[in-house]
Amino acid sequence: MGIEIQTKPFGKMQVSERQILSFPEGLLGFEEYKKFALIEEEEESVFKWLQSTEEVDLAFVVIPPSLFKKEYKPLIPEQELLGIGINEIKESLTLVIVTVPGEDPSMMTANTQGPILINKETLIGKQFISRNESHSVREKIFESAAVEIG
């Protein structure tokens, strides 16, 4: 059964209940927004949208970090992972927020220091802070990439 939401990139659309994610603590800087829909831009695209179901103007472009950083391993204490009901990062859907500068999309960056982990069973997510010092809030995707962005 679908739920109708208003989105920033696509206007009004139907999403399935399995696309609605709960973030009990919100996202960093947006703690008041707790529900987001994970929307695929196009089937063949690596990009997805994390769209607030509570605020139409709040949407983030996200991708799995493994697409441009094969050995991506955020360092997050196990006790924090238990907060979303997982024991290991590999049990989650891992995404990072992408910033695409309008003037030069080839300069897009990803926040590898603030990964979003989602429990695939419960659909509860959280944005964590990776303790891995090699991660950055503005990692250039194309410099790290072994990806072909469609």
From Swiss-Prot:
Coiled-coil segments on the chain, per record: none
GO cellular component: cytoplasm
Places the protein is found: Cytoplasm
Protein name, UniProt field: Flagellar assembly factor FliW
Name of the coding gene: fliW
Similarity comment text for this entry: Belongs to the FliW family.
Primary subcellular site in the record, as a coarse category: cytoplasm
UniProt keywords, alphabetically: Bacterial flagellum biogenesis, Chaperone, Cytoplasm, Translation regulation
Highest taxon listed in the record's lineage: Bacteria
InterPro entries: Flagellar_assembly_factor_FliW, Flagellar_assmbl_FliW_dom_sf
Quaternary context: Interacts with translational regulator CsrA and flagellin(s).
Function: Acts as an anti-CsrA protein, binds CsrA and prevents it from repressing translation of its target genes, one of which is flagellin. Binds to flagellin and participates in the assembly of the flagellum.
PANTHER family, alphabetized: FLAGELLAR ASSEMBLY FACTOR FLIW
Gene Ontology terms: biological process: bacterial-type flagellum assembly; regulation of translation
